[in-house]
Amino acid sequence: MPVPIVIESTGRAERAYDIYSRLLKDRIVLLGTPIDDQVASLICAQLLFLESENPEKEIHMYINSPGGSVTAGMAIYDTMQYINSPVSTLCMGQAASMGALLLAAGAPGLRFSLPHSRIMIHQPSGGFQGQATDIDIQAREVLRLKQSLNAIMSQHTGKPLEQVALDTERDYFMGPEEAQAYGLIDRVLTSRSEATDTISK
């Protein structure tokens, strides 16, 4: 699918942007695909660039993602925590698996969802092949990642680690209100003005 081009008029001049560059100008980062290494590199680069532009100003991350690679998702997560700029997150459509973790990892008070989105949490999975020893090594690594992800989710939601571990044993789907009660988001938004009101407070 071709990337749309938008034309912006400034006085007597006109300038053409691809839509993602235009959003970046407003400090908006869009995660709208499954998460892989290439996507993670692009998202991390945008976050680092926006921090260099103004480390005190908020960055808006809009999420519509089914999740994906754990290591790629953790690169985005660590970058969000590393930079000085606060990152607000907003789920539009769905935030599943690593997408849900990134949604929950937004700055406190700045984690939102639109009213008809869905959020899903679960444990990491992997398909293993090879010799028994290799399979055992991979299985132990998945267990390590599971414990790490559960600890992060517990930290950002305020839920006990044991509860998170239980809830992520299988796919756990939530609507926005349930996700708010769980601690994954802070507020359900129906209009942009509501987000502005929240930030101004």
Swiss-Prot record:
The UniProt entry annotates the active site at 97, 122
Coiled-coil-forming residues are none
**Entry EC no(s):** 3.4.21.92
Q: Mainly resides where?
A: cytoplasm
Does the record bear Lyase in its keywords? no
Q: Which UniProt keywords apply?
A: Cytoplasm, Hydrolase, Protease, Serine protease
The superkingdom of the source organism is Bacteria
Q: Which organism is it from?
A: Nitratidesulfovibrio vulgaris (strain ATCC 29579 / DSM 644 / CCUG 34227 / NCIMB 8303 / VKM B-1760 / Hildenborough) (Desulfovibrio vulgaris)
Gene for this protein? clpP
Known role: Cleaves peptides in various proteins in a process that requires ATP hydrolysis. Has a chymotrypsin-like activity. Plays a major role in the degradation of misfolded proteins.
Q: Name one GO molecular function term.
A: ATP-dependent peptidase activity
Query: Which compartments is it annotated to reside in?
Result: Cytoplasm
What biological process terms from GO does the record include? protein quality control for misfolded or incompletely synthesized proteins
The record's PANTHER family line, in alphabetical order, gives: ATP-DEPENDENT CLP PROTEASE PROTEOLYTIC SUBUNIT, ATP-DEPENDENT CLP PROTEASE PROTEOLYTIC SUBUNIT, MITOCHONDRIAL
Q: Which InterPro entries match?
A: ClpP, ClpP/crotonase-like_dom_sf, ClpP/TepA, ClpP_His_AS, ClpP_Ser_AS
Q: How does it assemble?
A: Fourteen ClpP subunits assemble into 2 heptameric rings which stack back to back to give a disk-like structure with a central cavity, resembling the structure of eukaryotic proteasomes.
The record's similarity note reads: Belongs to the peptidase S14 family.
Name of the protein in its database record: ATP-dependent Clp protease proteolytic subunit
Q: Which PROSITE patterns match?
A: CLP_PROTEASE_HIS, CLP_PROTEASE_SER
GO CC entries: cytoplasm; endopeptidase Clp complex
Q: Catalytic activity, per the record?
A: Hydrolysis of proteins to small peptides in the presence of ATP and magnesium. alpha-casein is the usual test substrate. In the absence of ATP, only oligopeptides shorter than five residues are hydrolyzed (such as succinyl-Leu-Tyr-|-NHMec, and Leu-Tyr-Leu-|-Tyr-Trp, in which cleavage of the -Tyr-|-Leu- and -Tyr-|-Trp bonds also occurs)
